[in-house]
């Protein structure tokens, strides 16, 4: 029988919260040109806290979101090293950036609902 250990799930949630704050501070302080056009909408950390998926929302619609995410993924090792300075963790998870499209989907659905009324 497999026993559920709530501490493992709780640990990944705590790491995700701390990682989200550290990434936000890093983008504000060191990557100021990026911080004005993107925001971190969420961080999901694996149960073993070795990998983290960072969901990024692009505020500026003139910028291609896929290019920004590709650039962030290319620089993920240097971003990870910079995040290490902000965190007091033994191991900083590997960062994988993804474009967050939930807000765009919400806007599209609300526009459709507004036109049907």
From Swiss-Prot:
Keywords: Cytoplasm, Ribosome biogenesis. The keyword Cytoplasm applies. InterPro entries: KH_dom-like_a/b (IPR015946), RbfA (IPR000238), RbfA_dom_sf (IPR023799), Ribosome-bd_factorA_CS (IPR020053). GO terms for cellular component: cytosol. Monomer. Binds 30S ribosomal subunits, but not 50S ribosomal subunits or 70S ribosomes. Belongs to the RbfA family. This is Ribosome-binding factor A. It comes from Anaplasma marginale (strain St. Maries). The lineage of its organism: Bacteria, Pseudomonadati, Pseudomonadota, Alphaproteobacteria, Rickettsiales.
């Amino acid at each position: 029988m497999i026993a559920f250990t709530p501490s493992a799930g709780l640990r990944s949630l705590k790491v995700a919260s701390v990682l989200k704050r550290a990434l936000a501070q890093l983008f504000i302080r060191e990557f100021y040109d990026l911080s004005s056009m993107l925001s971190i909408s969420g961080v999901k950390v694996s149960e073993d806290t070795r990998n983290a998926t960072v969901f990024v929302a692009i505020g500026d619609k003139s910028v291609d979101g896929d290019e920004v995410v590709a650039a962030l993924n290319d620089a993920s090792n240097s971003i990870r090293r910079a995040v290490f300075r902000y965190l007091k963790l033994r191991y900083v998870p590997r960062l994988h950036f993804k474009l967050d499209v939930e807000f765009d989907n919400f806007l599209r659905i609300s526009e459709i609902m507004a036109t049907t009324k």
